Amino acid sequence: MSKVLVVIDIQNDITKHYKDIVDGINKAIDWAKESGMYIVYIKHNNTTAGTRTFKPETKGAELVPELNVVSNNIFVKTKSNALTSEAFAAFISENHINEFYVCGADATACVKSTCFNMTKAGYSVHVISDCVTSYDLKKVDEMLAYYESKGCEVKVLAEYTA
Protein backbone atom coordinates (compact mmCIF):
# COMPACT_ATOMS: atom_id res chain seq x y z
CA MET A 1 0.00 0.00 0.00
CA SER A 2 1.44 3.33 -1.06
CA LYS A 3 0.40 6.73 0.20
CA VAL A 4 0.53 10.13 -1.46
CA LEU A 5 0.02 13.74 -0.45
CA VAL A 6 -1.91 15.54 -3.19
CA VAL A 7 -1.56 19.35 -3.31
CA ILE A 8 -4.33 20.69 -5.56
CA ASP A 9 -4.20 23.95 -7.54
CA ILE A 10 -2.04 26.14 -5.30
CA GLN A 11 -1.30 28.39 -8.27
CA ASN A 12 -0.95 32.13 -8.74
CA ASP A 13 -4.48 32.47 -10.16
CA ILE A 14 -6.12 30.70 -7.21
CA THR A 15 -7.95 32.60 -4.48
CA LYS A 16 -5.92 34.94 -2.29
CA HIS A 17 -7.07 32.77 0.62
CA TYR A 18 -4.30 30.29 -0.25
CA LYS A 19 -2.03 32.52 1.84
CA ASP A 20 -3.95 31.39 4.93
CA ILE A 21 -3.11 27.72 4.30
CA VAL A 22 0.23 27.66 2.45
CA ASP A 23 2.30 27.39 5.66
CA GLY A 24 0.15 24.45 6.73
CA ILE A 25 0.52 22.84 3.32
CA ASN A 26 4.29 23.22 3.57
CA LYS A 27 4.17 21.51 6.99
CA ALA A 28 2.09 18.72 5.44
CA ILE A 29 4.71 18.40 2.70
CA ASP A 30 7.46 18.10 5.32
CA TRP A 31 5.43 15.47 7.21
CA ALA A 32 4.71 13.49 4.04
CA LYS A 33 8.37 13.57 3.03
CA GLU A 34 9.49 12.40 6.49
CA SER A 35 6.83 9.66 6.37
CA GLY A 36 8.09 8.35 3.03
CA MET A 37 4.97 9.31 1.10
CA TYR A 38 4.90 10.36 -2.50
CA ILE A 39 4.18 14.07 -2.91
CA VAL A 40 2.36 15.32 -5.99
CA TYR A 41 1.27 18.74 -7.14
CA ILE A 42 -1.79 19.14 -9.33
CA LYS A 43 -2.03 22.18 -11.57
CA HIS A 44 -5.16 23.32 -13.35
CA ASN A 45 -4.88 24.54 -16.93
CA ASN A 46 -7.91 26.35 -18.27
CA THR A 47 -8.22 25.67 -21.99
CA THR A 48 -11.69 27.19 -22.34
CA ALA A 49 -11.83 30.02 -24.87
CA GLY A 50 -12.63 33.44 -23.46
CA THR A 51 -11.33 32.77 -19.96
CA ARG A 52 -8.36 34.52 -18.40
CA THR A 53 -7.28 32.47 -15.39
CA PHE A 54 -5.09 29.36 -15.21
CA LYS A 55 -4.06 29.76 -18.83
CA PRO A 56 -1.25 27.37 -19.87
CA GLU A 57 2.24 28.89 -19.94
CA THR A 58 1.22 31.98 -17.93
CA LYS A 59 2.35 33.20 -14.52
CA GLY A 60 -1.17 32.56 -13.26
CA ALA A 61 -0.86 28.85 -13.98
CA GLU A 62 2.43 28.51 -12.07
CA LEU A 63 2.58 27.11 -8.55
CA VAL A 64 2.76 29.91 -5.98
CA PRO A 65 6.32 30.87 -4.97
CA GLU A 66 5.64 30.23 -1.26
CA LEU A 67 4.87 26.56 -1.92
CA ASN A 68 7.59 24.07 -1.00
CA VAL A 69 8.05 21.96 -4.14
CA VAL A 70 10.04 18.87 -3.18
CA SER A 71 9.34 16.55 -6.11
CA ASN A 72 9.01 16.59 -9.88
CA ASN A 73 5.62 14.91 -9.57
CA ILE A 74 3.66 17.80 -11.06
CA PHE A 75 0.58 16.83 -13.03
CA VAL A 76 -1.67 19.04 -15.15
CA LYS A 77 -5.42 18.65 -15.39
CA THR A 78 -7.96 20.51 -17.52
CA LYS A 79 -11.04 19.37 -15.58
CA SER A 80 -11.84 19.73 -11.88
CA ASN A 81 -11.19 16.06 -11.05
CA ALA A 82 -7.44 15.41 -10.71
CA LEU A 83 -7.98 11.78 -11.70
CA THR A 84 -8.77 12.98 -15.23
CA SER A 85 -5.07 13.74 -15.69
CA GLU A 86 -3.83 10.68 -17.58
CA ALA A 87 -0.30 11.21 -16.28
CA PHE A 88 -1.54 11.35 -12.66
CA ALA A 89 -3.71 8.26 -13.17
CA ALA A 90 -0.70 6.41 -14.60
CA PHE A 91 1.45 7.54 -11.64
CA ILE A 92 -1.16 6.15 -9.23
CA SER A 93 -1.24 2.82 -11.04
CA GLU A 94 2.53 2.48 -11.49
CA ASN A 95 3.19 3.21 -7.81
CA HIS A 96 0.28 1.12 -6.46
CA ILE A 97 -1.15 4.10 -4.60
CA ASN A 98 -4.43 3.56 -2.79
CA GLU A 99 -4.31 6.08 0.05
CA PHE A 100 -4.51 9.82 -0.53
CA TYR A 101 -4.00 12.81 1.75
CA VAL A 102 -5.54 15.85 0.07
CA CYS A 103 -5.00 19.58 0.54
CA GLY A 104 -5.38 22.70 -1.60
CA ALA A 105 -8.10 24.63 -3.38
CA ASP A 106 -10.88 25.12 -4.22
CA ALA A 107 -12.92 23.30 -1.58
CA THR A 108 -16.11 23.76 -3.64
CA ALA A 109 -14.63 22.73 -6.98
CA CYS A 110 -11.43 20.80 -7.70
CA VAL A 111 -10.87 19.46 -4.18
CA LYS A 112 -14.54 18.43 -4.01
CA SER A 113 -14.53 16.69 -7.39
CA THR A 114 -11.20 14.97 -6.79
CA CYS A 115 -12.17 13.66 -3.34
CA PHE A 116 -15.57 12.50 -4.55
CA ASN A 117 -14.09 10.62 -7.50
CA MET A 118 -11.29 9.09 -5.42
CA THR A 119 -13.74 7.65 -2.89
CA LYS A 120 -16.03 6.52 -5.71
CA ALA A 121 -13.05 4.63 -7.18
CA GLY A 122 -12.54 2.87 -3.84
CA TYR A 123 -9.48 4.74 -2.63
CA SER A 124 -8.87 5.73 0.98
CA VAL A 125 -9.07 9.53 1.13
CA HIS A 126 -7.97 11.79 3.99
CA VAL A 127 -8.72 15.51 3.74
CA ILE A 128 -6.40 17.77 5.74
CA SER A 129 -9.08 20.22 6.80
CA ASP A 130 -6.87 23.13 7.86
CA CYS A 131 -5.01 22.91 4.54
CA VAL A 132 -8.08 23.41 2.31
CA THR A 133 -9.53 26.75 1.24
CA SER A 134 -12.05 28.31 -1.11
CA TYR A 135 -12.91 31.55 -2.85
CA ASP A 136 -15.93 31.51 -0.54
CA LEU A 137 -14.65 30.81 2.97
CA LYS A 138 -18.22 30.44 4.24
CA LYS A 139 -18.50 27.23 2.19
CA VAL A 140 -15.44 25.43 3.63
CA ASP A 141 -17.18 23.86 6.66
CA GLU A 142 -20.06 22.73 4.45
CA MET A 143 -17.57 21.13 2.06
CA LEU A 144 -15.71 19.36 4.88
CA ALA A 145 -19.03 17.84 6.00
CA TYR A 146 -19.71 16.85 2.37
CA TYR A 147 -16.34 15.08 2.11
CA GLU A 148 -17.14 13.11 5.28
CA SER A 149 -20.57 12.19 3.93
CA LYS A 150 -18.87 10.74 0.85
CA GLY A 151 -16.50 8.57 2.88
CA CYS A 152 -13.45 10.78 3.32
CA GLU A 153 -11.70 11.07 6.66
CA VAL A 154 -11.45 14.76 7.62
CA LYS A 155 -8.90 15.86 10.23
CA VAL A 156 -6.59 18.78 10.92
CA LEU A 157 -2.91 18.29 10.10
CA ALA A 158 -1.89 18.00 13.77
CA GLU A 159 -4.07 14.89 14.10
CA TYR A 160 -2.19 13.22 11.25
CA THR A 161 1.26 14.23 12.43
CA ALA A 162 0.72 13.27 16.10
Language model features with spans:
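Glycine/Thr-rich phosphate-binding loops of Rossmann-like dinucleotide-binding domains
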Residues: K16, A49-G50
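Short hydrophobic beta-strand that contains or immediately precedes a catalytic carboxylate
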Residues: V7-I8
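Active-site-adjacent betaalpha module
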Residues: S2-V4, D13, D23, K27, ...
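Short acidic, Gly/Ser-rich segments with clustered Asp/Glu that frequently serve as metal-coordination loops
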Residues: Q11-H17
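Flexible, glycine- and charge-enriched loops at secondary-structure boundaries
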Residues: Y18-V22
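Von Willebrand factor
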Residues: A32-T48
